[in-house]
Amino acid sequence: MNRPKREKKSITDVSTLKSLEQIKRARDGEKRTDQLQEEDDERKRLEQLKEQETEFDKEERKRKNRDFIEGDSGYRETSDNEDEDEDEDDDGDNSDDDYSLDEDDEDGGGDGENNDSDQEEAIEVGRKKKRQVKKKSKKDENGEPKVKTPRVKKTKEKKNEIVPEKNRIIQFINNPTESKSTSNNESFFFDKLKKSNSNTLNSTNSTLNSNELSSGGTMSSLDIESMLNDLQSAPDSELDLEKLKEKQLELEKKLEKEALLNKPTISTETIITEGVELDDNYEFDFDFNNPITTNNNNNNNTKTTTTTTTTTITNKNLNKVNSMSLPTRPQAQQFISPKQTNQEDWWSKTGVDSVVLVKKLEEIMPKNSDLLKMNMDGSLDFFLLTTEEDKQGRIILFGKVKLQASKSNKPGGGGGATKQTSITDEPVTKVPLKYASCCIIIEKMERNVFFLPRDYKLDQDGESTTIQVTDTMIEAELKQLVDRSKIKDYKLKKVKRTSAFDYSVPHKNGPVGEQHYVWKLSYPSNQMVFPNDIKGSTFRCAYGITSSPVELFLIKRKIMGPTWLTVSGITLNFDQKKSFARYEATVKSFKSIKPSMYKNEPSPPLTVMSISTKSVMKGSSHEVVMISSVIHESISADGPTENQDSIKYITAIRPLTGQVFPPDFQKPGASTTKQNVTICTSERNLLSFFCETVLNADPDVFAGHNIIGYDIEVILDRLEKLKVMEWAFIGRLKRSSFDRFNHISGRLICDSYLVCKEFLPKEKNYSLVELSKNQLSINKPEINYLSIEPYFETTKKLNIFIEINENDCYIIFLLIFKLLVFPLTKQLTNLAGNQWDKSLKSNRAERIEYLLLHNFHEKKYLLPDKIYQKSSSSGGGGGAKDKDNHAAYSGGLVLDPKIDFYDRYVVLLDFNSLYPSIIQEYNVCFTTINRVKRDDGKWEEAMPPPSSIEKGILPKVLHGLVSKRREIKKRMEQEKNKIIKAQYDIQQQAVKLIANSMYGCLGFSHSRFYALPLAELVTRKGRENLQKGASIVNKMCYDVIYGDTDSLMIYTGVGTFNEAETIGKEIQKKINDQYRGSVMEIGLDGIFKRLLLFKKKKYACLKEFRIDSTTTKCERENKGIDIVRRDYCDLTKDIGQWVLNLILGGEEKIALFSLIKEYLESVQQQIKDNTLAVEKFIITKTLSKQPEEYNDADIQPHVQVALQMRAKGLHVQPGEQVPYIITHGNSSSDIKEEWHHRARAPSDVESIQDVDIDWYLSQQILPSIQRNTGPIGMEPHELAQWLGMTGTKYQKQFDHLQQQSNQDFKPRYTLSTEDLRYKQCKSFNFECPYCGQNNEFTGIVKIDSEGKSESGFDCNQCHAKIPLKKLANQLQLNIRTYLKQYNDWDLRCTECEKVSKNYKETSYRCARPQCRGKMIQIMTSSKLFNQISFFSKLFRNDLSNSDNTTTIIPNEDQNTLKQAKQIIDSFLSKFDQYNVNLNSLLTPSQTLDSFNNYLASSRASIQYPILNK
């Protein structure tokens, strides 16, 4: 068997490149690190072999010495006499055996010669094994005889000797870099650099021409080992390593220049489109070649181009559009450190203090109260952060306490304090205070249940008797109930309460505002809870059962969010603590806690720990490989944080399973070694270290981006599966069993993903990359989760991996600082009185709930039951949904938009806080308005109470909020201190958010304070006020072109900003005159210089506003259009943005058409040339639930891609934006898949050829451009042609529109489906009795291919006239088909789209298991009416621009129309909506005929746009 020879290493091999450290050691004559390592490895190997040597090894060694000999070709078996002719078949290639033979040959060769018996036994064993090997080797893998091949005997090669040159490195340093001829030594280093950058250069450039080498020898013959050995044997202390580094840098620059010269160039065609400045808030990614030159002269005809887009569109009329070209595909992603981006190097600002010291639990916990600051009366000042309830019914408070200021030391991780600025008049302590975490355990908390007595007692059968209920009777029954429930330590007394709310339990409802005597039962919270619908013979119902102990504690003790509390009667615990807080105390009763007298004292600083977790998939589990944390111990909760750079950071990382780190990673003394990085040996060790770090840092808040949906979930899952002993350290409460639902007790969680969704509603993408770019102007590098493994290949990549993860933690702090998350959410919580962690999770419904609970409890009202239902909705002005998902009441009024392009000024008027103002104006409250249900279960329409009724609680609360905000804003204007001014601004924002959310609790069906009649009253009054405002505008002879809920758009027709502003203020004053002495008020919200109004809630405008008295500025604003929607690709958005910029830029219509034509043709050319980037076709859509929970996943492309991503091990959670591209699909299949089955993740799309361009053109690009250009009169078929869509499917649709001679017929006969009512209607098809052709009837007149008009009743194939009776018969059959569908009452599921008549009787839900869809009727009465009305519209005989219809329509067709009209009307007459008396719409001086004549004349005067080429 031949030993494989080791290949000689070439100096140009990347694997043999040596570092400067090796050269340095060789220069000093020392052994190099690789030599030392090899010697250690060899020594360890020999020692291990000797230790593992056994008797079996000795026997095996004897056999090998007997049966194997060493020849020229290595080891081979000895041949017996009977097998000499088959000697070649015994050739082997087992490297492991070869390795063993080396050792055996050296130290075991003589054993067989001294022992004859062992020798004979070994011979026999060897021969048996040889025969078995021969039998196997004679056949191949398929069992066929193996063909013998003669073995070629290899000759032993001799190594090429290299003449030692100890000065070659010195010669390399002294030679000039720019020399044309490269020396032997320079070639070595130059070659080395080229090899290390082989991914950017062609392999042909990695070696130098042999003619350029000196006569000393060729590069291929040089050996780096020989060079270093020469230097090591003859040390040269004068070798300058710094010069060597400089020389290497020069060669790197030279290499980069060579790479640029060899880099392929991609040319793109551009069109000259000059003159309009573009919006830089939108990412064009266009390539602008020349800088723009501006000139204030309007008559300047100089062609200009621009280098960037701009958010401001100037008032100047420009004639041409900027030159631009769409981008090419970017290069592959590289490993980029955050330090190489535009972000500042925050690591350099940290010092030795940035290292987190990890100590044992007993080292960081205080042993006594010496450092704790107590009050003179023995009470303790405690700042509340969060509240928990344990299984025993105890209340546990977590917060912070003050430490003695005179003591210099403090408990570890307690959080350093900074000087806080107060906005109160109280003096600020100059001595910096120190704080530590604390836990307060309330041993005794109680529940309160209120029993409402009956008027008459019930008998045993539940029937009412004539016996009146007395106090003695009800008290006796309640005591029996308590004894039966084994409740102890209770109190029972009679109290007075008022009812005002609606309950889900019917027998709880009572008259509004009526006072009752009820029996209050107070008992410990750790005992049983009564059923919510409980009733007895002497009591009708019970209230307060659903209130939790935490809720009662906050309400009864009047605790309004995070604030200072005074705790008396405490017992400090230092042994057998129940928490990991630094201090722990116990109180007997909740009454020992009350708000502090100094509740306005500055809040203690927060210790915030942001974390970022990286994991790899193994099976279905995420295995954690790295956790980074950045810790800030002094974040202000009252205002901006002053010292934002005072941070600590730490990273724990482990090697991938089955691998090791690179040898020089975190090597002691190395320049790349990081002091804040801890290497862990396993995942279990990493998680244990992380938990210990949390214990030492003791953070008050965990922060992270999607930390709730990913980081915490992954960490807890791995802690549980790996059974990490320290798992409880992640929270502040000691636990003996794992609790996934209450895992981080005592610490707040700030998820920047949820926070940004609430406070940055205009963002389109809430990924950390996009938020960093848009909010912080930072180009954050992103880790490819598909390939984390490559980061572990080298030390450099590992360090980049760590830096990116640490940087993610730091960016979270930057977002927190910018949005002032903690001060703002604290103010919101202080106003509402709820818990801080719920405000951080953007639970807006709970804020209003607690605000009203505090107010109604203070007035002694019976509180409504708590609703334990999940819903993603939060209510709003659009009308709530009932249980069948229908609108329970009408929302805001939306006036029909007058779709057009307005190139003169439009003003926007907006009611200030419309719904809160209505609640105050009309005294809308639970306590002032009776709600009555009809017999059918629906609510009667509520009416405003009389003015004599006292103001309700809702109007009072809102009035208090509005007054408070007004006062805060007044103080803010007078304040000079920037920090205090920022605090005032935070407070007024919080008040505004609370006030504007008040209406939501009325209309949100899952709200605790849901009151549908009140919500309907508010929206009804909103509609009335908007309609009243529109009427006033019309009386002033201005045109209301659109209105929505609380705003009006008014066309002024003027051409200057000042004139428009004057008109707007005039209209504002006129409307506000109707509300004198009222809180209702309308304001001038905006002035639009140009407006493209598409449809309801969709428009684009150029908004102009005043900077100072003489200067104005314009900005683009889009609402609801395609370029702001996530489900449109960037190419569609770019084109749409360009077109809108052009239209709003003030160009003449003729110029617009030509410029748009040129631009679209250039886009077409780039599509043909495949020069567009694949990324331009990415569509994103939000995943609303788990991918497996979708019943219609097969037709949802983003769900399909999400499932594909999960199959690859990617983490996809609800709420994430899923990107995908529509491709050609499976090219091997002859049948093309549906488009939703051809969706792929962007990483799976290799090139532009894989993208289905036709789908994007027809489904995204063309419809978007058509909508944007529709108001200016551009035709869809021309747009399609300019985009290269010349296929028959587009041509058939638009060919007949090109005939100018028949333009008059277009509005009536060719575009009859444009009415939104008929969008889903099907056309009438009739069969020709002569040729059997199926014809679609589009109108009484149609245009043929030659532009001639012909009857719509003629066959398209044989052009024969369809007989009248045949047509009438087919029309009746067609209508009866739809009638049959209606009468059959077929239902279709909204989720799985199953058609059936079966459904769940109570809820109309789908009968299929696991399907949550609702069964809806396929053919409803409204659909049937619209369908038949559509037929009526098709058979109308009035032409839009012709006074004499008889000259166009033949008599024969007139008779056909008449009979068809009679058939259709006979069906329509059966519908109620068809028989409408229009006389009610007329004035006394009008008649129906005169009104019809007026409509006909108005219709004839309409001028339809004609395309000017």
UniProtKB/Swiss-Prot annotation:
Record-listed Zn(2+) 1 binding positions: C1328, C1331, C1355, C1358
Protein family per UniProt: Belongs to the DNA polymerase type-B family.
Catalytic activity: DNA(n) + a 2'-deoxyribonucleoside 5'-triphosphate = DNA(n+1) + diphosphate
Name the UniProt record assigns to this protein: DNA polymerase alpha catalytic subunit
Compositionally biased tracts (Acidic residues): 80-123
Gene for this chain: pola1
Family matches, as PANTHER family: DNA POLYMERASE ALPHA CATALYTIC SUBUNIT
Keyword Ribonucleoprotein on entry: no
Compositional bias per record (Basic and acidic residues), positions renumbered to this chain: 21-35, 42-79, 138-147
Top EC group: transferase
Additional observations: In eukaryotes there are five DNA polymerases: alpha, beta, gamma, delta, and epsilon which are responsible for different reactions of DNA synthesis.
GO biological process, one term: DNA synthesis involved in DNA repair
